[in-house]
Amino acid sequence: MHSLAEHPEVMSRTLGRSIQGRPIQALITATKSEVVYFFGRQHPPEITGGLAMQSFIDEVFSDSDLANEFRARFMLVLVPLINPDGVAAGHWRHNMGGRDLNRDWGPFTQPEIQSVKRLIDELDDAGIAPKLMLDFHSTQRSRFYTQMPEDFDEELDFARDWLDRARLRMPDFDFLYDPRKPSGQENTKNYFYATYHIPAITYEIGDEVDRAELRRTSPIFAQEMMRVMLERD
């Protein structure tokens, strides 16, 4: 996402350093009263998740009327490479501390997650309200881990509305809407829902999804995300 750092609306900020000293970079837009978070590459080998995030975010920063309206309303925070050491070393899931970073959202023992948490706390202290968190990953089959429908008022069930709309536009793309009850697992999704009671979704793309299919479908997911978010008060 290096080209995005050159976007006129984006500020690049080093949040901290990994265990081996690599920067944890965030891309941040202008301050608004509401913020949407996008995270990626907590698990090093999950390539399709990273590629999906790239195409998704490219659509969010496009010059369409929809994208411009979305960026005018929401502050956006992107941390696309949370585990740079693991990526460099070819690790399966862990950082150089031997920790799965997507199980450190609670203990906050690792410098990579501590760096991201400091920014979240900073925006909290400034009164900026989180409205959505998407965490991009890969797995065997494309699926979206969400909260349960009963966790929100029916008219505020973002995940259901978002994924239903996306499916209508691409019925040939195989993915699962996979609501889960809150658990004790200390991952990003559970942390954001427990702390802020907002839609917090693990966006999983199948390991074998064709790259051209990612480029076709990710912008549609982004467009429908923006539409649903803009409809909410």
Regions found by a protein language model. Give the residues of each.
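Non-catalytic propeptide/linker segments at domain boundaries
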Residues: 1-9, 15
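Short glycine-rich, acidic/polar surface loops and turns
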Residues: 25, 180-196
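Active-site/substrate-binding loop(s) of hydrolase catalytic cores
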Residues: 12, 17-19, 23, 31-176, ...
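His/Asp/Glu-rich mid-to-C-terminal helical/loop segments that flank catalytic regions of hydrolases
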Residues: 209-233
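Generic secondary-structure signature for well-ordered alpha-helical cores
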Residues: 6, 121, 168-171, 226, ...
